[in-house]
Curated annotation (Swiss-Prot):
<dbReference type="GO" id="GO:0045259">
    <property type="term" value="C:proton-transporting ATP synthase complex"/>
</dbReference>
<dbReference type="Pfam" id="PF02874">
    <property type="entry name" value="ATP-synt_ab_N"/>
</dbReference>
<keyword id="KW-0406">Ion transport</keyword>
<keyword id="KW-0813">Transport</keyword>
<keyword id="KW-1278">Translocase</keyword>
<comment type="function">
    <text>Produces ATP from ADP in the presence of a proton gradient across the membrane. The V-type alpha chain is a catalytic subunit.</text>
</comment>
<dbReference type="InterPro" id="IPR024034">
    <property type="entry name" value="ATPase_F1/V1_b/a_C"/>
</dbReference>
<dbReference type="InterPro" id="IPR027417">
    <property type="entry name" value="P-loop_NTPase"/>
</dbReference>
<protein>
    <recommendedName>
        <fullName>V-type ATP synthase alpha chain</fullName>
        <ecNumber>7.1.2.2</ecNumber>
    </recommendedName>
</protein>
<dbReference type="InterPro" id="IPR055190">
    <property type="entry name" value="ATP-synt_VA_C"/>
</dbReference>
<comment type="similarity">
    <text>Belongs to the ATPase alpha/beta chains family.</text>
</comment>
<keyword id="KW-0375">Hydrogen ion transport</keyword>
<dbReference type="InterPro" id="IPR020003">
    <property type="entry name" value="ATPase_a/bsu_AS"/>
</dbReference>
<dbReference type="InterPro" id="IPR023366">
    <property type="entry name" value="ATP_synth_asu-like_sf"/>
</dbReference>
<dbReference type="InterPro" id="IPR004100">
    <property type="entry name" value="ATPase_F1/V1/A1_a/bsu_N"/>
</dbReference>
<dbReference type="GO" id="GO:0046961">
    <property type="term" value="F:proton-transporting ATPase activity, rotational mechanism"/>
</dbReference>
<feature type="binding site">
    <location>
        <begin position="233"/>
        <end position="240"/>
    </location>
    <ligand>
        <name>ATP</name>
    </ligand>
</feature>
Length: 591
């Protein structure tokens, strides 16, 4: 422990002297109030400290005490359904302890409740050899999540004691005799430094798709479990709603939602909506699998920088248990702005648009912690982290540094488009500019699992949309009537795909989520219409005849998005009806 004194205060940056025995990334208690800070730069005996609480009223001469520990999170039962701030302070217990709706400075509250008792059920017995990552036992944390208590990193040996029963997170639950003869006493809780990724046995290639229930994503721009995706877009394009939809309906075990520097009302929406929503996979409330980290725009700027790391470390902990985890960061641009502010106060040489030169490496550091892995331990298990980051480029300009550095790392780009949002086409993901480098892997995975021709259908649908884009300029110049019959059909089918398939109402109880079988049935109907109508045109039918003769079935295709999942056969039955009506048009020989 080292004690120094403050010599300079500049917003969230405090410089202290007499810190020659301190280390970089040490946590400090700053001033008489004991504010939480982290050393980010050392020069001789002077330490630059970024303070995670409001520094007004702090002055030169006040003491700074180091703890000798890096910024760490507590990992154990009690994380699920909890809401933390950027440095893992539990906001509900913080409010009860301080009787204030605002963050009172200098208050230290443990992240995990020290009084709550958890029923521990051992899975191993005394005398067994254990290594780091082995599951010792379980705690039923919520109705959905079984919390698996693991042997901490760098601990291995013989299990000499393990107890069943109700324990707090600090009670000794098991004892391991290490190779050197010392006894390690373990509890339900472990700590981990947030800036250090948790070790794994092996990194694997992600192949299984993350089903989000959003048709434009699952069909055209899928992300895998263990993948990384970016959602850039201007203000009002729907980034937060896309993130909320994935957090609600993604087929993962755990969701970590990090509200980083965004509006407080958005976190309020999450708190109001999530407890009422039922997870379609488990039938329980979505909050039963969610961890919230709220670091809104009016909270100290330095804590934004920590909140992303806090979230990904908690995600890694659940991944190590063998769960699939999705982490949403909304928004990484606010995190980058916090880096820029601290870099400016440190008087570092600025890079593009004032961001620090190390912006790219910090963004890469975060996204590289996602992935599909084989975890540590003698028991074979896999876990995944899917990282989805919203990016808020000023004015929607995706050439700015945060977006460009993000796109260099992630494999999925869901580009939100202001013109689409203004036309009230939501989700406003532009199908011409977005991309997914997982498309081929996901397509072959689905074809193999479902025994269907899914990837071919997706390719055909995208070809129709791209053909429409090339025809639009001709239509604007000389009108729709100047097109050939086949091109007019292409324009009509493309409109069907856009309006009846890609458009999705997040606030409709049925349309908000579409399962994969329903997506396939809906897309098959539209493509069947295109195929049968093309055949009819080649046999001499007119475009107008086909459109008038199939008006009823096309209307039913348009309404199929509002048919509940349990009535899926109704949607599948439309395929035969499409063929029948077009054959009827041909049989009549004109209308």
């Amino acid at each position: 422990m080292n004690q120094g004194k403050i010599i300079t205060v500049s917003g969230p940056l405090v410089v202290a002297s007499g810190m020659q025995e301190a280390n970089i990334q040490d946590i400090c208690r700053v001033g008489h109030l004991g504010l939480v800070g982290e050393i980010i730069e050392m020069r001789r005996d002077q330490a630059s400290i970024q303070v995670y609480e409001e520094t007004s009223g702090i002055g030169p001469g006040e003491p700074v005490v180091t703890t000798g520990c890096p910024l760490s999170v507590e990992l154990g039962p009690g994380l699920i359904s909890e809401m933390f701030d950027g440095i893992q302070r539990p906001l509900d217990r913080f409010q009860k302890a301080t009787d204030s709706d605002f963050l009172i400075r200098g208050v230290a509250i443990p992240s995990l409740d020290r009084k709550a008792k958890w029923a521990f059920i051992p899975k191993l017995s005394v005398g067994q050899e254990v290594v780091a990552g082995d599951i010792l036992g379980t705690v039923q944390e919520t109705a959905v999540i079984e919390h698996r208590i693991m042997v901490p990193y760098k601990v291995s040996g013989t299990l000499v004691a393990i107890h069943a029963g109700d324990f707090t997170v600090t009670d000794t639950v098991y004892e391991i005799k290490k190779e050197d003869g010392s006894i390690y006493q373990g509890s339900l809780m472990q700590t981990w430094p947030v800036r250090q990724s948790r070790p794994v046995a092996q990194k694997l290639i992600p192949v299984e798709p993350l089903v989000t229930g959003q048709r434009v994503i699952d069909t055209f721009f899928p992300v895998t479990k263990g993948g990384a995706a970016a959602v850039p877009g201007p203000f009002g394009a729907g980034k937060t709603v896309v993130q909320h939809q994935i957090a609600k309906f993604a087929n993962v075990d755990i969701v970590i939602y990090v509200g980083c520097g965004e509006r407080g009302n958005e976190m309020t929406d999450v708190l109001n909506e999530f407890p009422e929503l039922i997870d379609p996979n488990t039938g329980q409330s979505i909050m039963e699998r969610t961890v919230l980290i709220a670091n809104t725009s009016n909270m100290p700027v330095a804590a934004r920088e920590a909140s992303i790391y806090t979230g990904i470390t908690i995600a890694e902990y659940f991944r190590d248990m063998g769960y699939s985890v999705a982490i949403m960061a909304d928004s990484t641009s606010r995190w980058a702005e916090a880096l820029r502010e601290m870099s400016g106060r440190l008087q570092e040489m600025p890079g593009d648009e004032g961001y620090p030169a190390y912006l790219g490496s910090r963004i890469a550091e975060y996204y590289e912690r996602a992935g599909r892995v084989r975890t540590l331990g003698s028991q074979e298990r896999e876990g995944t982290i899917t990282a989805i980051g919203a990016v808020s480029p000023p004015g929607g300009d995706i050439s700015e540094p945060v977006t460009q550095n993000t796109l260099r790392i992630v494999k999925v780009f869901w580009g939100l488009d202001a013109p689409l949002a203004q036309r009230r086409h939501f989700p406003a993901i532009n199908w011409l500019t977005s991309y997914s480098l997982y498309q081929d892997d996901v397509g072959s995975y689905i074809d193999r699992k479902q025994q269907s021709n899914w990837s071919n259908k997706v390719t055909r649908a995208m070809a129709i949309l791209q053909r429409e884009a090339s025809l639009e300029e001709i239509v604007r110049l000389v009108g729709l009537d100047s097109l050939s019959e086949q091109d007019r059909l292409t324009m009509a089918v493309a409109r069907q795909i856009r309006e009846d398939y890609l458009q999705q109402n997040a606030f409709d109880s049925v349309d908000t989520f579409t399962s994969f079988p329903k997506q396939e049935a809906m897309l098959t109907n539209i493509l069947t219409f295109n195929e049968e109508a093309s055949k009819a045109l080649s046999l001499g039918a007119y475009f107008n005849e086909i459109m008038e003769g199939t008006a009823q079935v096309r209307d039913r295709i348009a309404r199929s998005k509002f048919i509940p999942e349990e009535n899926l056969e109704q949607i599948k039955g439309l395929t035969q009806k499409v063929t029948k009506e077009i054959h009827h048009v041909l049989a009549k020989g004109g209308i």
